Amino acid sequence: MKLCRFAPAGGAVALGIVEGEEIVDLSPVDVPAEPAAALDEVGQEALERLAERAPRLGLSDAQLLAPATPHKYLGIALNYADHIAEMGMEAPEVPVFFNKQVTCVVGPGADIHMPRVSTFLDYEAELAVVIGKRCRHVPVEQAPEVIAGYTAANDVSVRDWQGRAQTMTIGKSFDTHGPLGPWLVTADELGDPQDLRIRCFVDDDLRQDASTGEMVFDCFQQVSHLSEAFTLEPGDVIATGTPAGVGIGRQPIRDNLLHVGDTVRVEIEGIGELVNTVVEEPEGFVAQSLPAC
């Protein structure tokens, strides 16, 4: 099942089920608009029954929004061997996580802002895990039971701000620098999350091309590790790392970073495309509250 958050023309944010080129509109029924919460509170089978008599609209007639509204957005660094090599670093012995502030989240088609304070803007294609159950101390073998599904992420990074801080959070958390989408694919439909092709294009230039099977720490290990420290909640997002090919890993670096007008396309097998375009940061921009993004 592919679940989305969307806003029909002139309408409020609603939950939808994507089927081909249509959205099954679940706004007439009393279900959460957030996919992970709907799966947790209503259940997938009940959503399928509700969809049988729900109205439909075309994908092109709705604005797709980020398919998760996380309380916590976490990312892992240095989780593909080829990316570790291109950065000239050594593989970590334990997962290295950082926070992305949730006000960075935007959906498919939204603009990525070139900050007024930097032009060292970079892309990172990533598979994102969306948590589906409130959980703590999850064994690796039980991690699939607490995952609602998966989506595509672009862990947009401001490299100079990232590099001069003791933690990566500030360089990873600028407003609009957390695109997610286009929808959440439930775990049962996606299958093995460690056997997916992941690619990133800047305009039509292929920059990243790898398999999620190349992760150092797989999705289930990441969920388990984080849950040892703190409670994970439905809708929380874990960006599971990026492969080689990021702009800062290419020469000349300046030419391979993002520029105003560039369109970034993250493609993940079994999920789809997440497309966003870089624009100048608008004067006076303030991020919307998360449910509206």
Question: Model-found features: residue ranges?
Answer:
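Structural signature of FAD isoalloxazine-binding scaffolds in flavoprotein oxidoreductases
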Residues: E90-P108, Y123, H259-G270
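Short catalytic-site patches enriched in acidic/histidine residues
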Residues: V96-P115, C135-R136, T176-W183, A244-I248
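N-terminal non-catalytic cap/leader segment that marks the start of a structured domain
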Residues: M1-P95, T263-E267, F285-C293
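Residue "hotspots" at secondary-structure boundaries inside conserved domains
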Residues: A66, K72, T119-L121, S224, ...
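Catalytic-pocket segment enriched in acidic/His residues
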Residues: E48, P55-G58, H83, R159-C293
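A generic local secondary-structure boundary/capping motif
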Residues: C4, Q63-L65, E86-G88, I112-L121, ...
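Short, structured patches in soluble enzyme cores that scaffold and shape functional sites
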Residues: A7, K100-V102, G109, R116, ...
